[in-house]
């Protein structure tokens, strides 16, 4: 039984917000247990002897005078082997374990289980540099655990630890609580195991932040080619309902070039999380000749719309802390938050119950500051400790503004913070053009940062992208004229612009995420397709302009009649399957097509 003094008493209850008295001496954001069922809560306001607590579970049945137990520590997550492949709720309770314990599909109140299994034994290999008498500091790698084929889990010292090694465990099988290392510093000895506990609201420290310059390739042509994101960048995907936000964030977690994925479902439909749970184990990837499930590099934080509201706020912080932990191992982590609007709505509800002054649309005045403090935890960094390593956290936040209105406070606050904006368009989605990214309003501020990467690997790409954007922009301007006077009255070169823009829109920007050949498009294929499409445009413009003065003019109709087959081949470039055909064959096919086009136009001009 805890000392009497560590108890307060419930003074008032209003939904998820509980007021308690006799709480003097407790700290802001301290974790407390409310009532006889010991519900998890967090102190969010202190006034004199009274504390206001937001409770992360259903508060029905809590009465005045119920005990409130102070734990003396902030809301924290457990970090160690066993995170990958599991699914947690917003305060890192493992849903599978709860289901096994309770034999029920609902989470009962006051259930408390360990986030990481205490029974599972892991094969620990001690680091070569570690020996008794050596000196270590925070962030140093103690050893590694092969968690699965995809994740080699490095066991790190907590950032605050340092000292002289007095004991090192030999390699072997251990649980997460067994002592692996003992340090002595200033006469005090400390024991360390695989498990660390970290408060979710504090960002994990790093040595320094680096400039991000490696692209996050996500296998969607429109994103990789026109609006690239970097590893360590921040991205917002705002869009109305049914525009395909969830499909984009799921395909990012399936096919992007990240080492680990943290997927936070924050206040979205439960079906979407179960879809992820059903799809991901079936998806496989090749690692050193063995196929393994993609779920092995994914951790899910599920906080669906029917779970308590307050835990939504925590789930975003839980997710980003897990992501930072894997970043500290030197991995590139991508974190999907679907959707930050629901998180903002949770903030609004709690703020309303506290009686704070509402700002725009009833959201609290600190909405932008909270969003910024979350997005600023992304970035590419040099990790603490030795050996030297670099890691990154990329945040992709889906925003669902009511009615698809981008002037909504959450969307406008987010756009002021993030560097990449993938705006989804309801009209495109209704035309069944997916991914429904509007290429006229989206933007990416990482173009300059990525130029070096493109120059080194795909030197012609930057020019192609500029040309492609010009064609799409011109087509937008011409479409107004066409609606007034029809196509026939346009100049020949403008007709070519329109036709090529149509090819680019239908066969390059559009992508069917449910077919084997098109659900993932590697970057070489993206560049190859763009190169041929722009090549066709340049050749056609050239031959029309060169023969404009002579008797036998080449017009778009002539090109269309003579080149029907080549135009079809341009459209059919997307049907090349990168898995079945392989890179060399696809590159060769695209080069052959480019040659055929050049010959075709040469014969036409002769």
UniProtKB/Swiss-Prot annotation:
Coiled-coil portions: none
Keyword Aminoacyl-tRNA synthetase: no
Family annotation (PROSITE patterns): ATPASE_ALPHA_BETA
UniProt keyword terms in alphabetical order: ATP-binding, Hydrogen ion transport, Ion transport, Nucleotide-binding, Translocase, Transport
Stored InterPro entries: ATP-synt_VA_C (IPR055190), ATP-synth_a_Xtn (IPR031686), ATP_synth_asu-like_sf (IPR023366), ATPase_a/bsu_AS (IPR020003), ATPase_F1/V1/A1_a/bsu_N (IPR004100), ATPase_F1/V1/A1_a/bsu_N_sf (IPR036121), ATPase_F1/V1/A1_a/bsu_nucl-bd (IPR000194), ATPase_F1/V1_b/a_C (IPR024034)
Catalytic activity, EC: 7.1.2.2
Keyword ATP-binding set for record: yes
GO cellular component: proton-transporting V-type ATPase, V1 domain
Pfam families, alphabetized: ATP-synt_ab, ATP-synt_ab_N, ATP-synt_ab_Xtn, ATP-synt_VA_C
Reaction equation(s) it catalyzes: ATP + H2O + 4 H(+)(in) = ADP + phosphate + 5 H(+)(out)
PANTHER family in the record: H(+)-TRANSPORTING TWO-SECTOR ATPASE, V-TYPE PROTON ATPASE CATALYTIC SUBUNIT A
UniProt record similarity statement: Belongs to the ATPase alpha/beta chains family.
Protein name as catalogued: V-type proton ATPase catalytic subunit A
Gene name, Swiss-Prot/TrEMBL: vha-13
């Amino acid at each position: 039984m805890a000392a009497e003094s560590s108890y307060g008493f419930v003074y008032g209850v209003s939904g998820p917000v509980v007021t308690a008295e006799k709480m003097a001496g407790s700290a802001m954001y301290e974790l407390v247990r409310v009532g006889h069922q010991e519900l998890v809560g967090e102190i969010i306001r202190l006034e004199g002897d009274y504390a206001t607590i937001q409770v992360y579970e259903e508060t029905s049945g809590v009465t005045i005078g119920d005990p409130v137990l102070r734990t003396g520590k902030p809301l924290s997550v457990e970090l160690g082997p066993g995170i990958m492949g599991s699914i947690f709720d917003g305060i890192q309770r493992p849903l599978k374990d709860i289901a096994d314990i309770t034999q029920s599909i609902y989470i009962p109140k006051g259930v408390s289980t360990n986030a990481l299994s205490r029974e599972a034994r892991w094969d620990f290999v001690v680091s070569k540099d570690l020996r008794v008498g050596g000196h270590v500091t925070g962030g140093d790698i103690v050893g590694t655990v092969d968690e699965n084929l995809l994740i080699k889990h490095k066991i790190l010292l907590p950032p605050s630890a340092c000292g002289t090694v007095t004991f090192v465990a030999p390699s072997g099988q251990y649980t997460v609580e067994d002592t692996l290392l003992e340090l002595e510093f200033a006469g005090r000895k400390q024991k360390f195991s695989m498990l660390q506990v970290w408060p979710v609201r504090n960002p994990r420290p790093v040595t320094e932040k680096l400039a991000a310059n490696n692209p996050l390739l996500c296998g969607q042509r429109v994103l990789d080619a026109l609006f690239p994101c970097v590893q360590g960048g921040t991205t917002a995907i705002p869009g109305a309902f049914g525009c395909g936000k969830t499909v984009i964030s799921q395909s990012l977690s399936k096919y992007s070039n990240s080492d680990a994925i943290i997927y936070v479902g924050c206040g979205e439909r439960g079906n979407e999380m179960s879809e992820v749970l059903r799809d991901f184990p079936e998806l496989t990837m090749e690692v050193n000749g063995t196929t393994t499930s993609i779920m092995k590099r994914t951790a899910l934080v599920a906080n669906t719309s029917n779970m308590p509201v307050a835990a939504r706020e925590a789930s975003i912080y839980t997710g980003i802390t897990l992501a930072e932990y894997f970043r500290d191992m030197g991995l590139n982590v991508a974190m999907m938050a679907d959707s930050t609007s629901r998180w903002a709505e949770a903030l609004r509800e709690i703020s309303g119950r506290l009686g704070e002054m509402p700002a725009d649309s009833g959201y609290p005045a600190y909405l932008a500051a909270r969003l910024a403090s979350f997005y600023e935890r992304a970035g590419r960094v040099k990790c603490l400790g030795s050996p030297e390593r670099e890691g990154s956290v990329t945040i992709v936040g889906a925003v669902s503004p009511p009615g698809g209105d981008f002037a909504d406070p959450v969307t406008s606050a987010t756009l002021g913070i993030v560097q990449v904006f993938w705006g989804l368009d309801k009209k495109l989605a209704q035309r069944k053009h997916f991914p429904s990214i509007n290429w006229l309003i989206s933007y990416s501020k990482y173009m300059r940062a990525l130029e070096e990467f493109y120059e080194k690997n795909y030197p012609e790409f930057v020019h192609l992208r500029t040309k492609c954007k010009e064609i799409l922009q011109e087509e937008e301007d011409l479409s107004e004229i066409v609606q007034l006077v029809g196509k026939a009255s346009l100049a020949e070169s403008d007709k070519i612009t329109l036709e090529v823009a149509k090819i680019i829109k239908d066969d390059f920007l559009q992508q069917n995420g449910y077919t084997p050949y098109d659900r993932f498009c590697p970057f070489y294929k993206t560049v190859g397709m763009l190169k041929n499409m722009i090549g066709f445009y340049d050749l056609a413009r050239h031959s029309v302009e060169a023969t404009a003065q002579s008797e036998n003019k080449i017009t778009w109709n002539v090109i269309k009649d003579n080149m029907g087959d080549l135009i079809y081949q341009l459209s059919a470039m997307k049907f090349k399957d990168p898995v079945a055909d392989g890179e060399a064959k696809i590159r060769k096919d695209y080069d052959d097509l480019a040659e055929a086009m050049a010959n075709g136009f040469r014969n036409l001009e002769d």
